[in-house]
């Protein structure tokens, strides 16, 4: 990869976007950003608090602005929030400004990876987590697929293995 293209990671919560993104950025000597962490940095509050105070719509507005700004940079790896693809504007920007990698995973793996994580506002509800994740998958998976240049399943692989797969796919294209 001679030129430094932007790499944008999309996929559901628990797919490994942040972990794999950090690994990928380190291996490629690129700058790493996580849209949720960037929102937390700018607001001085965690994502759950922003959700509670501003609602999902307020959070998505912030997310859209942050992703717009970050995707204007060059040579970055960006881990997006799982719901960021709900915005057509965000989908268009991701597609136009870099390579979109869809990190795909099963509901079972999502449950295992998120069960103790209290920073998942959409799972902090009365509805059983499996039902929430299934509903989100039905709504969002087609949107991830719509903009993906590359799709990689992350279920039984380490972050380093997935990062290497992404690098190999990018180099062969």
UniProtKB/Swiss-Prot annotation:
What Gene3D superfamilies does the record tag this protein with?
Answer: P-loop containing nucleotide triphosphate hydrolases
Subcellular location(s) per record: Cytoplasm
Query: Is Protein transport one of the keywords?
Result: no
Q: Which residues bind Mg(2+)?
A: 18
Entry GO MF terms: ATP binding; magnesium ion binding; shikimate kinase activity
Its main localization is: cytoplasm
Q: Which SUPFAM superfamilies match?
A: P-loop containing nucleoside triphosphate hydrolases (SSF52540)
- In the UniProt record, the signal sequence range is none
* Keyword Endoplasmic reticulum on entry: no
Pathway assigned in UniProt:
Metabolic intermediate biosynthesis; chorismate biosynthesis; chorismate from D-erythrose 4-phosphate and phosphoenolpyruvate: step 5/7
Which amino acid positions bind ATP, per UniProt?
14-19, 120, 157
How, per the record, is the cofactor bound?
A: Binds 1 Mg(2+) ion per subunit.
| Catalytic activity, as annotated | shikimate + ATP = 3-phosphoshikimate + ADP + H(+)
The entry's family comment says: Belongs to the shikimate kinase family.
The annotated subunit structure for this chain is:
Monomer.
HAMAP family for this protein: Shikimate_kinase
What is the recorded name of this protein?
Answer: Shikimate kinase 1
Instruction: Name its species.
Output: Pectobacterium atrosepticum (strain SCRI 1043 / ATCC BAA-672) (Erwinia carotovora subsp. atroseptica)
């Amino acid at each position: 990869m001679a030129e430094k293209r932007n790499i944008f990671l999309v996929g559901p919560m628990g797919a490994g976007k942040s972990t794999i993104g950090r690994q990928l950025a380190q291996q490629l000597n690129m700058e790493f950003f996580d849209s949720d962490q960037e929102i937390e940095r700018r607001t001085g509050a965690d994502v759950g608090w922003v959700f509670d105070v501003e609602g999902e719509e307020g959070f998505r507005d912030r997310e859209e602005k942050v992703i717009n700004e970050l995707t204007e940079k060059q040579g970055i790896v960006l881990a997006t929030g799982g719901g960021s693809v709900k915005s057509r504007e965000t989908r268009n920007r991701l597609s136009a400004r870099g390579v979109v990698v869809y990190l795909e995973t099963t509901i079972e793996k999502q449950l295992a990876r998120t069960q103790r994580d209290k920073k998942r506002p959409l799972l902090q509800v009365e509805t059983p987590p499996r039902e929430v994740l299934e509903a989100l998958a039905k709504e969002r998976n087609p949107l991830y697929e719509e903009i993906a240049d590359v799709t990689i399943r992350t279920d039984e692989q380490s972050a380093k293995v997935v990062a290497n797969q992404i690098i190999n796919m990018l180099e062969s294209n």
